[in-house]
Amino acid sequence: MKHLLWLAFFALPAFAQGPALDDLSKDDLEKVSNEIAVNFSHTAVAAPSTDGLWGIELGLIGGVTGSPKMKELVEDAGEDGSDFKRLPHAGLMARAHFPLELFAELTFIPTVESSDLELSNRTFALGWNFGSFFSWPLDVAIGAQTSNSKLEFDQVLNNASTGNTNVDTTVKFDSKTTTLWVGASKTFAIVTPYVKVGVFKSETDVEVNGSSGDIFDFSSEQKESVSSSGGFGTLGVNVNLLIVRLGLEASRAAEV
């Protein structure tokens, strides 16, 4: 489950360090890759609504995604998995709406580097509020959204593929997601609840860069690709306070 708070500054800290992964089965790789992909998939924590011919919003987003498989795999590798039971994320958001009740959303995390980890994320969404276009009593919209995230971390690998010697490696997750949805919202005074449902797909390339070694138990290659798909659903609420909009959202995609 992915939980998000718009303008929630306490949710902004990102990964302090990279996880340790080893001996991943195909199922392990698919599940942990999907957790990472869902965590960095698109959201602006905004109702699928429009207001007037033109408009733009700027803000911050932050939140966490439950990641039981990541925690399990880190512990299987002999490390403390408690720091990875939830994956954090944060970023900048821009949202604009245009004539004909069209709207676009953009979020991004500038490339962030620590001593052993690097992270970047870009997402984009486009939607049409046909409920407002046809003057219906509530906003009903369709939309499509994509994301492209990169997470890489340094790891000392020691397993059969390295001859049981320590090898310095960099593990890279390059994830892309696509979501198609239909949503509805209705404003009551300053409160706007909303819902979205649709379909979600992720594709992830996982690569180990080092002089030797891999982290897969089903392959001797240093690079593997996996994908996942499933349903998508979001429940959220916006609170409009003069020039500030606050939001809270919970979503689920492909069983994460």
Regions found by a protein language model. Give the residues of each.
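Residues on the lipid-exposed face of transmembrane beta-strands in outer-membrane beta-barrel proteins
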Residues: A47, L60, L92-F98, F124-W128, ...
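Transmembrane beta-strands of outer-membrane beta-barrel pores
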Residues: G62-G66, F108-V112, F130, A144-K150, ...
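Transmembrane beta-barrel domains of Gram-negative outer membranes and organellar outer membranes
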Residues: Q17-F133, S147
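Repeated loop/turn-to-beta-strand initiation elements of outer-membrane beta-barrel proteins
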Residues: L100-L106, F133-V140, I190-P193, L241-L248
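Residues that define the transmembrane beta-barrel architecture of outer-membrane proteins
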Residues: G52-W54, K85-L92, L117-F124, W136, ...
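Sec-dependent N-terminal signal peptides
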Residues: H3-P13
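Flexible, solvent-exposed coil segments and beta strand-coil junctions
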Residues: P99-L106, N158-T165, D214-D217, V239-I243
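Extracellular/periplasm-exposed beta-strand and loop segments of Gram-negative cell-envelope proteins
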Residues: K69-E75, E79-K85, V112-L117, T146-T178, ...
